[in-house]
Amino acid sequence: MSKQKKFEENLAELETIVQSLENGEIALEDAITAFQKGMVLSKELQATLDKAEKTLVKVMQEDGTESDFE
């Protein structure tokens, strides 16, 4: 079983991909592959953030202090 990357590792990898695409010194085929990888990472990061938000909302609701998280 492979260890799933941490949020921070995925974010750092996404930032590296964005920088390489922005500098324009990457071959087209590599840019397409990097873009696709970046989209996957972006979706994974968003899912992690959504899960964290739901967890916080649940904790706050159980505590009785807040019922909506925005």
Swiss-Prot record:
Subunit structure: Heterooligomer composed of large and small subunits.
GO MF, any single term: exodeoxyribonuclease VII activity
GO cellular component term of the entry, any: cytosol
Reactions catalysed, as given in the entry: Exonucleolytic cleavage in either 5'- to 3'- or 3'- to 5'-direction to yield nucleoside 5'-phosphates
Keyword field: Cytoplasm, Exonuclease, Hydrolase, Nuclease
Protein's job: Bidirectionally degrades single-stranded DNA into large acid-insoluble oligonucleotides, which are then degraded further into small acid-soluble oligonucleotides.
Source species of the chain: Streptococcus pneumoniae serotype 4 (strain ATCC BAA-334 / TIGR4)
NCBIfam families in the record: PRK00977.1-2, xseB
Protein name, as recorded: Exodeoxyribonuclease 7 small subunit
Record Pfam families: Exonuc_VII_S (PF02609)
Gene Ontology BP term (one): DNA catabolic process
